[in-house]
Amino acid sequence: LKQFDELGPSGEFLMEFSIYDAIQSGFNHLVLITRKENKDFLFNYLRERINSSIKIDVVIQETTNLPIGMTANPKREKPWGTAHAVWCAKDFISDDFAIINADDYYGYNAFKNAANFFNSSTDENNYGLVSYKLKDTLSDFGSVSRGVCKVSNDKLSSINEHLKIERTDGIIKDFDSGNILDEDDYVSMNFWLCRSNFFNYLDSYIEKTMNELENIEKDEIYLPFAAQQLLEDNIISIEVVDSNSGWFGVTYAEDKKESVKKLREFSQSIYPIPLWKG
């Protein structure tokens, strides 16, 4: 798994830098959603590194774990997708919470701004999305898939998925549609800021969507689609929070070398070496 690639100067996983930044920003509870075979390793690995004041839970995403009244399909082996993964954490979270990918680097400012969002707003139907400029999320080694945000008065109106974005000759283009995209457009990198009531919404969304899947053995239930449905139904509003940060990830094998280089540079100025000193 690329989530367990040792990219940091002392062999750290990429997710460890996000965890470190989140803790520095005031987050005090870590919930990881993973496969059964990774549970013990992840918990033990992080528990021995992270201060005991930080609560750690590791949750297994199981295909048989479904909303009450739903029956698991015995033929289903593939995980149900990101919306279901988050729903699986429902018994471990009772407060507002942030969601991130384990294999992305988001930057300290992104977590600081996420914490500020929660500290400044308690409206249970005002959610957030920490967003990045499109130009800062491209790969030098091939096309990327991005959800481009339509924003009005700092609120998210919609997210449009573009599956083949690439910069050529200084122009950013969606090669599926042929459309030229603005490099300063905000995009979603799945850094969501949610309220505890999100699990209630996910209950009904998962049930409805699962009943509409064309291929019950392979199709997935995606977190951005769940958020967008709530937005379209006027159940929630989603504030677009500027990350004020750079992003990077490992989309292609060639990205790995660049990620190692960036983490080494950051560790000379931002992070301690090793990351979890003492």
Where are these regions (language model features)?
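Short beta-strand-to-loop acidic/aromatic patch adjacent to the donor-nucleotide binding site
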Residues: 94-105
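Phosphate- and divalent-cation-binding pockets in alpha/beta enzyme and binding domains
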Residues: 41-42, 109, 201, 226, ...
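N-terminal glycine-rich phosphate-binding loop and ensuing alpha1 helix
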Residues: 1-47, 54-56, 61, 95
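A C-terminal functional module that forms or caps the active site or interfaces directly
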Residues: 203-235
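Conserved core of the sugar-phosphate nucleotidyltransferase
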Residues: 108-192, 196
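Short, surface-exposed amphipathic charged segments that create phosphate/polyanion-binding patches used
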Residues: 68-79, 142-147, 254-258
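Short phosphate-binding loop-to-helix
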Residues: 50-96
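Hydrophobic helical membrane-anchoring modules
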Residues: 234-237, 244-278
